[in-house]
C-alpha cells in the first residue's frame, strides 16, 4: 500500500506540481530583472526588444550578458534537480515500476514548463525571452554529453553564419535528435550509474523516447519564438553577432 501511495504521489509531483513551480521559476526572467534592478530600465524597450542574453550583451555589455546567460541556464537545472530530490528522497518512490516503466524519467517533464515560463513569464505580462539559454540548461540536465556537442555545434554555426538566432535554432534541432543515439545519450537522473548505462542499451532506448519528446516540444517552442528572426534572416535584416572581432558600426 505504501508503494502504491509513493507511485501515485510521484505521478502527481512530476505531472502536476513540478510543472507549476517550474513555470513560476522559469518566469523569473533574468534579463528583465537585471535591467530593472541595475539599470532602472526594461531591456524589452531596447534594440531587438528581446528579453535574453544576446540583447542584454548588445545593450549593456558582456558582463550582464554572461550573467543573464548563467541565470537562465540554471533555471531548468534547479527545477529538475528539485523534482528529482523530492522524488528520490522525500517520496522514496521506486524508480522502476512492476510494468517495467522507469518513472524517474518523468522528473524531466517540468523542464518544458521552465522554458514556457521563460518565454511567457506570468510576472512580466507574458512577454519574455526566446528560450535559448533555458533550453541549454534543460539539455545539460537531460544529457551532458549531447550538451557539450551542442555548445560546439552552436559556436561553429555562429562563426560561419554570424546569426545567433539561426545558430540556436539549428543547434536545438540537432541536439533534439542526438539524444536518440546510444553511447552519447547518457541521462543522469534516469541512468544513475554510467557503467550500467553502457551495458543496458535496451533500457536506455525505452527512456530516451520520453526525453526526446520533451526536447522536441522545447525545441519547437524555441523555434516558434524565433519566427520574427526567421523573417529577418530571409529579408537579410537580421542583426549579426561577432564573437572574436569588433562589431561593425553599421551593425549596431
Swiss-Prot record:
<protein>
    <recommendedName>
        <fullName>Glycerol-3-phosphate acyltransferase</fullName>
        <ecNumber>2.3.1.275</ecNumber>
    </recommendedName>
</protein>
<feature type="transmembrane region" description="Helical">
    <location>
        <begin position="66"/>
        <end position="86"/>
    </location>
</feature>
<keyword id="KW-1133">Transmembrane helix</keyword>
<feature type="transmembrane region" description="Helical">
    <location>
        <begin position="164"/>
        <end position="184"/>
    </location>
</feature>
<dbReference type="GO" id="GO:0008654">
    <property type="term" value="P:phospholipid biosynthetic process"/>
</dbReference>
<feature type="transmembrane region" description="Helical">
    <location>
        <begin position="6"/>
        <end position="26"/>
    </location>
</feature>
<feature type="transmembrane region" description="Helical">
    <location>
        <begin position="140"/>
        <end position="160"/>
    </location>
</feature>
<keyword id="KW-0472">Membrane</keyword>
<feature type="transmembrane region" description="Helical">
    <location>
        <begin position="104"/>
        <end position="124"/>
    </location>
</feature>
<dbReference type="InterPro" id="IPR003811">
    <property type="entry name" value="G3P_acylTferase_PlsY"/>
</dbReference>
<feature type="transmembrane region" description="Helical">
    <location>
        <begin position="204"/>
        <end position="224"/>
    </location>
</feature>
<keyword id="KW-0808">Transferase</keyword>
<keyword id="KW-1003">Cell membrane</keyword>
<keyword id="KW-1208">Phospholipid metabolism</keyword>
<keyword id="KW-0443">Lipid metabolism</keyword>
<comment type="function">
    <text>Catalyzes the transfer of an acyl group from acyl-phosphate (acyl-PO(4)) to glycerol-3-phosphate (G3P) to form lysophosphatidic acid (LPA). This enzyme utilizes acyl-phosphate as fatty acyl donor, but not acyl-CoA or acyl-ACP.</text>
</comment>
<keyword id="KW-0812">Transmembrane</keyword>
<dbReference type="GO" id="GO:0005886">
    <property type="term" value="C:plasma membrane"/>
</dbReference>
<comment type="subunit">
    <text>Probably interacts with PlsX.</text>
</comment>
<keyword id="KW-0444">Lipid biosynthesis</keyword>
<dbReference type="Pfam" id="PF02660">
    <property type="entry name" value="G3P_acyltransf"/>
</dbReference>
<dbReference type="GO" id="GO:0043772">
    <property type="term" value="F:acyl-phosphate glycerol-3-phosphate acyltransferase activity"/>
</dbReference>
<comment type="pathway">
    <text>Lipid metabolism; phospholipid metabolism.</text>
</comment>
<comment type="similarity">
    <text>Belongs to the PlsY family.</text>
</comment>
<keyword id="KW-0594">Phospholipid biosynthesis</keyword>
